[in-house]
Structures are given as C-alpha cells and as structure tokens.
Amino acid sequence: MTNPTRTSTQTDPGGGAVRGLSSYAQLTEVQLPAAGTFALITLTGGEGKPATFSSESLLGLQEILVEVAARVNSGQVAGVGITGQNRFFVAGADIKALKDLKDLGSARAVARLGHQVFGALEAMNVPTFAFINGAAIGGGLEVALAARYRTVSTDANAISLPEVYLGLLPGWGGVYRLPRLIGPANAVKVMIENPLANNKVLDGRSAYELGIADTAFDSPDFLSQSLAWADRIITDAARREELDQRRAAIADSSREEWDAAIAAGRVIVESKTSNAAPAPARLLDLLELGRSLDQAQSADLEVNALGELILSPQFKDSVYAFLELLQRRAKNPSGAPDPALARPVNKVGVVGAGLMAGQLALLFARQLHVPVVMTDIDQGPRG
C-alpha cells in the first residue's frame, strides 16, 4: 500500500493553527491511497507540553470540528482522526482551570461543553478514529472514546480515567461510553479499582487487550500504521461491520453483568475509602441509574454530578495538594540549594503507597514526564 501523504494544513483566519489558552489543535489534510482525503486533528500543548482541556482549548477543538463537519457533509472528507504529539495524546482536563470555577452554573457549563465538543466528533457522518500515540488521561481518554475506532501505541504508558482519585468522575461521556465498549466489569476496573489502587494506569497493550483500542502498533511508525489501518477500515465495509457487531455484543451486557460489576465496585469503594469519598460512590450511582438510559439522559446526569463535584471540598483539597502547596513551595523554597547545583531529573522514586504518595507520584509523572516508581516500606515496587 502506498504511504499516506499530507497535502495541506487548515488554519484559522489569522493564519495560525487554531489555539486555546492551554492547548493547540491543528487540522491537516492527509491523502490516503484508497479512501482519499482524511482530516487529521493534532492536539498539542505547545513547547513540548502535553495538551490539556480547558474551556478555551475545548472551544478551539470545537471550531475545527465544525470546519471538518462542513467538509464531511459536502463530500470532501472520507474520514476524521485525532491524535497527539510526542509522548502524549491528551493529559486530561486543565485541573487548575477547574479549580478556579466558583459557582455551580460555571462548573456545569464546563461539563456540558465537553459533551458538546466530543459529541461533535462522534456525530461525524464518516468513520472517526483516535490514534492514541501516548498518555491519554481523563478527558484525553474520553475524547478518544468518542471516536468510532481507536488505535494505540504499544509505547503508551499512561491510559486512565483517574477522576475519582481527584474527587471527580469521568463526566465528559466516559461514564456512558466505557462500559458499553469494554463491558461494565472492566469499566469498573478502569474507573474505580485502578484509581483507588494508588492511581494505577494501563499501558498500550493492556488498553488493547481490554478492548479500549481496536488494534495496537509499535511506536516508531505508529502514525503511518494508524493511517494505513484507517484507510483499510474506511474502504472495507465488511471489516467495519465486524468491529461494530463485536462492540454491539458488549454494549448489550445483561442486567446480571451490570449488577455484578456495580456490586463489586461498591465493595472496592468500601474497602478503600470506607465510603468517606463521595466521587467513587457517585460514579457507581450513575452507572446504576444510567445503564437503562439513552446517551442524552446519561449526559444530563454526568453534567450535574461533575459540576457538583468540581465545587466539592474533596476536589479542592486534591488540587491544593497537587498545585498550590507543591508549586508555591517550589517557587519559594526555604533553604533551597544554589540553582547552579541542579541536575536533570530522569526518574523519581516515592517511598510509601498511601494517598499522599500516590498524589506525589502522579504530580511528578505529569510535571516532569519521567518514570515514577512507588515502593511501600514492606513491599516491592508498584509502578
């Protein structure tokens, strides 16, 4: 098969890539050998930083999706894909921006905006793809779930929905889409069990094995392999039907499967939090209520719940631990050594496996982009 070629880049009227305050979104036309024009959206935070979703960056992505939808509807585009850059797909929501929200109306508006933007990707009248090239955390994984098909890099090392760990829940569609993609039991594992197990994450192969991705490719040629696979899917109706039927069978999970998964989740929440943390219990309530609802009804529940949790003391405390305390002390440390003595940090070890240790590990991974190993006093390495 001839390799896909990029032919042009669409920009905003100002001549640059559409940009939000915390993320860039760039649209490139790729010519696929069989399918024709493919719209590839690349998200990046700029200057080597991972993309995150704030209101501004979501609106930037929405602007591009409106442009793409118009081209799709006029027959100019055969497929749509979204990917990231470097080692990151999307690093989730802009937590600092969420922390600054002061009222329920604003919090719910941000929750609703995520649904609107991701829904625009889902509603495209051509096959849609997420090429998960690296870390896909929280809202990053949720936007990937809004695509019809997904590829994942075998080198991706942080795929997760960690929201309950922070006092939130996956309120941009994850609560509805994930259990219908991988089954309720696996969804509880990803959304409840893993976050409460010191924020355990999936790697690319694990995500593929769970069914989050339809196929996995090695890193050096990940994008070109993903584009070639998309070309085959777009032009092979039988293959698309096979994937869709497999997905439909999982989405039609029995009442008993849902009951068992939710019950198992409640046991985990009780054992890990003694039911003192509202977010995981609220998530399980949404799963129980939403399993018989349509997507729009589930979205309303997610928006209300996420809005309330954004304003909760638990989330504010988590953000304080993540951002305020550590960053402020990093800027104004007491007894700091001479900066000339600083050396590059290539990896981090955290002794301890409790809540604070887990928060520190996640902070180091997000801010330093280096491997982090957690070791309990009486146990071996955990990550």
Regions found by a protein language model. Name each.
Residues 2-40, 44, 49, 142, ...:
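Amphipathic alpha-helical segments at domain termini/boundaries
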Residues 305-316:
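Long amphipathic alpha-helix in the N-terminal Rossmann-like dinucleotide-binding domain
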Residues 104-241, 351:
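Conserved catalytic cores of soluble enzyme domains
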Residues 341-383:
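Phosphate-binding active sites in nucleotide-utilizing proteins
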Residues 57-61, 110-113, 302:
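Hydrophobic alpha-helical membrane-association signature
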Residues 36-45, 58-105, 116-133, 153-158, ...:
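A structural preference for short, pocket-lining loop segments at secondary-structure junctions
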